[in-house]
């Protein structure tokens, strides 16, 4: 036989050429065909001609004879998404289980319970010698779990208290973090110099690095604890704002000291570069966040025709700001916070109400799941072999964290109180110092330490875990009874009324004017300047014009315009002194409304007057608001009954000689036995069947309000006497249908020309005293009569003249 190579290829050209052409026609498989055909040449070995069955398409394996399996298991194919789904499901079920027993979350914070669940799972994983899931890496924490929590906190942060206390928050976050980092680091370095403790190999820079990461007040732990105790808004915004900005400062100091530890020699230029980097990282993150927030607002200006993607822009631009800042080694926390606060101001006015609800609840869901996973992963990662115990280092670390935190708060507050209008009390300072909870930030940072540079990394991990567990468990559990014992001012859950908001804005303008007159540039002055700049430039650029108004506002506007035109026609709007002769007073006529106009008015009122108002309540972090339709319906029912009682009471106390300018009667409700149009009658029957109406039919039939415009005070005396006799008071006693005793029933009301009934022009009211009514209520047979019912009738235009004429002596 000839050797493999040219001779063999010349011997059998037709099948190979046909196969090559066939595979090349098939597309990308041509390259694979050439590789398979040239493989024997490259190896220099003899081989038999390739059969079509031996050529394998890309992405498949060689043909093997096998049978079709009935059941297969391929866990590695879905391992990562399957485990992530199970972790999220476990975290959600754990939260449901905690809240089944209502007293448990009030005694023990939810974060403590989740850490305990994580410790239990970590012990199980460690016992079966399994590795931790891939989701527990520190990169996953900083890139996927932390951004939703910071986004939720920044988007729904109360902006006015934050900016009013911005100086104090920055004072605590920047100066306080430097105070704690340097104080803890230097103190631990002094402890390490004692040879008896065996810590002499830890340098000053390593202690400063550990002090910077252990001084990070975690916003996740602070939110989990302080939202349950409901402290006042100022105290909450100080602690939360400090924890939010404190993390950004901590990360900058951490990277700075970490770079110094990796350098062999540190020069003076490196120190100044580190200080400059401190400001560049913070300010750069804020600028990136504001810029992308403006872009998000400008984008949502053009989404009125496609509302579905509006919530998507909020999450995309906010997360883009975070990862962009991290890409340039800037502060991602500052970037996403600034972006969220900017979007909350402008994006909310461009998106629809449904999109806003979607944003709110989806953001709440993401933050809640991320927070739950963080605490569970902290418990799981605690159990392992990466620990080194040293009593001196661990105990002194915990003591120095508490001491330097308390000293920093009291010293810095004493300085900042000189510049505050409302100084912080001793109780507030104590709660701020007590609320310095450590959490996932320092836990993740200590795991990021390179083991080659830090040989005592396991000791740092152990000390950080002890500090985290002490602050979360001991301080977190005892802070609620401590707040109650000190009687710290709590938050007011009452929603601000419209009048209160108007008065607050009025006082803001007054204080701004006073500051302008005095030449003092306070926060009121700068807020007013920014508002003018915002109205003049930013809102015109970022907010869509011709914002749609709600139906109730449009209806109210139409009714007000119609009422103003009517008042102008009747002359009631004139309040300036008149120089016309008082004797020359003529009765003004009002154009009667056509039946079609009356039907239209009644239809508008019946459709829109008593609709339940839909309100968006204030944001609560983890608890969904209950359905308020029943409560709003009860509120409307109470207000309607109260207004009806007040109107009857006021009309009873009116002067009998009230003047009337016209004889036209306008009814708020229809007179008794008046037939409705078919459209309104069907709607009324449907509403009564559904139970929407809260007033009984009997009351609606007997209670008729006569709405007549008030006349001028200079009407002639004869006309006022004539109008004052339009009402009379008398009894109307109603007895049971079965008894034939009692007073005779009143005569039937005469029919009008239109076919409806006219109510008599008599106002029936009880005139007897309480004792006399009790005596008359007994009949001859001893059966008590039913109490008289108050019936109020209004006069009809057709019967007024005849009744007034019959009453004359």
From Swiss-Prot:
Glycans are attached at residue 350. It is a multi-pass membrane protein. InterPro entries: Cation/H_exchanger_CPA1, Cation/H_exchanger_TM, NaH_exchanger, NHE-2/4, NHE_CaM-bd. GO terms for biological process: proton transmembrane transport; regulation of intracellular pH; sodium ion import across plasma membrane; sodium ion transmembrane transport. The gene is SLC9A2. This is Sodium/hydrogen exchanger 2. The keyword rRNA processing does not apply. Plasma membrane Na(+)/H(+) antiporter. Mediates the electroneutral exchange of intracellular H(+) ions for extracellular Na(+). Major apical Na(+)/H(+) exchanger in the base of the colonic crypt. Controls in the colonic crypt intracellular pH (pHi) to direct colonic epithelial cell differentiation into the absorptive enterocyte lineage at the expense of the secretory lineage. Residues 648-700, 734-809 are annotated as: Disordered. Its main location: membrane. It is found in: Apical cell membrane. Keywords: Antiport, Cell membrane, Glycoprotein, Ion transport, Membrane, Sodium, Sodium transport, Transmembrane, Transmembrane helix, Transport. The chain crosses the membrane at residues 107-127, 138-158, 169-189, 209-229, 237-257, 278-298, 308-328, 361-381, 392-412, 430-450, 459-479. Interacts with CHP1 and CHP2. It catalyses: Na(+)(in) + H(+)(out) = Na(+)(out) + H(+)(in). High levels in intestine and kidney. Strongly expressed in gastric epithelial cells, with particularly high expression levels in mucous cells. It comes from Oryctolagus cuniculus (Rabbit). Residues 648-660, 793-809 have a biased composition (Basic and acidic residues). It comes from the Eukaryota. GO terms for cellular component: apical plasma membrane; brush border membrane. GO terms for molecular function: potassium:proton antiporter activity; sodium:proton antiporter activity. Belongs to the monovalent cation:proton antiporter 1 (CPA1) transporter (TC 2.A.36) family.
């Amino acid at each position: 036989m000839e050797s493999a190579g040219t001779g063999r290829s010349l011997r059998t050209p037709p099948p190979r050429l046909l196969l090559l052409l066939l595979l090349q026609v098939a597309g990308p498989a041509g390259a694979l065909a050439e590789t398979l055909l040239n493989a024997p040449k490259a190896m220099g070995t003899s081989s038999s001609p390739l059969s079509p069955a031996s050529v394998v398409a890309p992405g498949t394996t060689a043909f093997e004879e096998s049978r079709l399996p009935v059941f297969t298991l391929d866990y590695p194919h879905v391992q990562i998404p399957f485990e992530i789904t199970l972790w999220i499901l476990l975290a959600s079920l754990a939260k449901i289980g905690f809240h089944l027993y209502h007293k448990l979350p009030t005694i023990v914070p939810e974060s403590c319970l989740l850490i305990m669940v994580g410790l239990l799972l970590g012990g199980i994983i460690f016992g079966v010698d399994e590795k931790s899931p891939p989701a527990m890496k520190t990169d996953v924490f900083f890139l996927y779990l932390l951004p939703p929590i910071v986004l939720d906190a920044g988007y729904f942060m109360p902006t006015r208290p934050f900016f009013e206390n911005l100086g104090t928050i920055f004072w605590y976050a920047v100066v306080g973090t430097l105070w704690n980092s340097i104080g803890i680091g230097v103190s631990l370095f002094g402890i390490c110099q004692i040879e008896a403790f065996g810590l002499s190999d830890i340098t000053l820079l390593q202690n400063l690095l550990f002090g910077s990461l252990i001084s990070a007040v975690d916003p996740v732990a602070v939110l989990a604890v302080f939202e349950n105790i409901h402290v006042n808004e100022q105290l909450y915004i100080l602690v939360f704002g400090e924890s939010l900005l404190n993390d950004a400062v901590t990360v900058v100091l951490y990277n700075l000291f970490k770079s110094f530890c990796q350098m062999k020699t540190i020069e003076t230029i490196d120190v100044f570069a580190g200080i400059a980097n401190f400001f560049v990282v913070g300010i750069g993150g804020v600028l990136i966040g504001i810029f992308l927030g403006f872009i998000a607002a400008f984008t949502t200006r053009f989404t009125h025709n496609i509302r579905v993607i509006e919530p998507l822009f909020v999450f995309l631009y906010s997360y883009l700001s975070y990862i962009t800042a991290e890409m340039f080694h800037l502060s991602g926390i500052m970037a996403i916070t600034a972006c969220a606060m900017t979007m909350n101001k402008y994006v909310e006015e461009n998106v629809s109400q449904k999109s806003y609800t979607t944003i709110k609840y989806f953001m709440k869901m993401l933050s809640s799941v991320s927070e739950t996973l963080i605490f569970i992963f902290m418990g799981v990662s605690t159990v392992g072999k990466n620990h080194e115990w040293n009593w001196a280092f661990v105990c002194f670390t915990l003591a120095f964290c508490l001491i330097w935190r308390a000293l920093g708060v009291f010293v810095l507050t004493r300085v900042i109180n000189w510049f505050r209008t409302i100084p912080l009390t001793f109780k507030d300072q104590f709660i701020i110092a007590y609320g310095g909870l450590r959490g996932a930030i320092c836990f993740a940072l200590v795991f990021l330490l390179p083991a080659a540079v830090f040989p005592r990394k396991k000791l740092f991990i152990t000390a950080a875990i002890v500090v985290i567990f002490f602050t979360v468990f001991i301080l977190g559990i005892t802070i609620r009874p401590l707040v109650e014992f000190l009687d710290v001012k709590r938050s007011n859950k009452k929603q601000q009324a419209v009048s209160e908001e108007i008065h607050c804005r009025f006082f803001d303008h007054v204080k701004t004017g006073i500051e302008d007159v005095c030449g003092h540039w306070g926060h009121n002055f700068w807020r007013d300047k920014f508002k003018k700049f915002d109205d003049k430039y930013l809102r015109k650029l970022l907010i869509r014009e011709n914002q749609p108004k709600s139906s109730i506002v449009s209806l109210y506007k139409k009714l007000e315009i119609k009422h103003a035109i009517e008042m102008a026609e009747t002359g009631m709007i004139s309040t300036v002194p008149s120089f016309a002769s008082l004797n020359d007073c003529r009765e003004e006529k009002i154009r009667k409304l056509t039946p079609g106009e009356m039907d239209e008015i009644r239809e508008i009122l019946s459709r829109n007057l008593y609709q339940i108002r839909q309100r968006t309540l204030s944001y609560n972090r983890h608890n969904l608001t209950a359905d308020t339709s029943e409560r709003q319906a009860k509120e409307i029912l109470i207000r309607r009954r109260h207004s009806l009682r007040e109107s009857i009471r006021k009309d009873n106390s009116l002067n009998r000689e009230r003047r009337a300018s016209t004889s036209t009667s306008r009814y708020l409700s229809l007179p008794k036995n008046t037939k409705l149009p078919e459209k309104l009658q069907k709607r009324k029957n449907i509403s009564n069947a559904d139970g929407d109406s809260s007033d009984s039919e009997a009351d609606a039939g007997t209670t008729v309000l006569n709405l007549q415009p008030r006349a001028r005070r200079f009407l002639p005396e004869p006309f006022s006497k004539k109008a004052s006799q339009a009402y009379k008071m008398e009894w109307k006693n109603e007895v049971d249908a079965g008894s034939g005793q009692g007073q005779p029933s009143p005569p039937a009301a005469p029919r009008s020309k239109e076919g409806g009934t006219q109510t008599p022009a008599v106002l029936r009211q009880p005139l007897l005293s309480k004792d006399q009514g009790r005596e008359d209520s007994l009949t001859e047979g001893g059966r008590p009569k039913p109490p008289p019912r108050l019936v109020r009738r209004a006069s009809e235009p057709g019967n007024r003249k005849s009744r007034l004429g019959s009453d004359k002596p």
